């Protein structure tokens, strides 16, 4: 069954942006953690850098997932659901720890940057749901 979503090209382009954002963010923090933490953000390195790098690697992998969605939105719709959960958890944790737990404020910036993606992903799922029911 061939499906076609209204504004499909716009949705596809936004998934490409989401993929590139997570690819770049994950790669940069994985490969250049010391430079960004100590050099740019003036933060000490974490006691166990592998935990930070594992999180960065997961962000990169989510970029791969969003690229799959870009390539075929209908076959990979469950990746969008995982993306919403992933970004909600990061945003919630970042905001909580910035405001209540002493986490450096810079990490909330990425939470704010994730908010439009969360909204976009939800709009996409609702639009696909309407198309399936129609």
Name the predicted role of every residue range:
Residues 1-8:
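Short, Lys/Arg-rich, polar N-terminal cytosolic tail immediately upstream
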Residues 20-30, 47-70, 82-89:
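Core segments of alpha-helical transmembrane spans in multipass integral membrane proteins
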Residues 91-109:
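Membrane-helix boundary connector in multi-pass membrane proteins
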Residues 27-30, 67, 95-98, 119-125:
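Membrane-embedded alpha-helical segments of multi-pass transporters/permeases
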């Amino acid at each position: 069954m061939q499906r076609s979503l209204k504004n499909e090209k716009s949705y596809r382009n936004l998934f490409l942006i989401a993929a590139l954002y997570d690819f770049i963010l994950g790669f940069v923090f994985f490969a250049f953690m010391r430079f960004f933490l100590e050099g740019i953000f003036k933060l000490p390195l974490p006691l166990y850098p592998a935990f930070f790098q594992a999180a960065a690697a997961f962000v990169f992998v989510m970029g791969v997932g969003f690229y799959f969605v870009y390539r075929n939105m209908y076959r990979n719709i469950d990746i969008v659901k995982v993306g919403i959960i992933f970004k909600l958890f990061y945003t919630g944790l970042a905001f909580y720890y910035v405001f209540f737990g002493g986490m450096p404020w810079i990490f909330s910036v990425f939470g704010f940057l994730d908010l439009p993606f969360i909204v976009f992903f939800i709009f996409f799922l609702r639009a696909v749901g309407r198309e399936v029911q129609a």
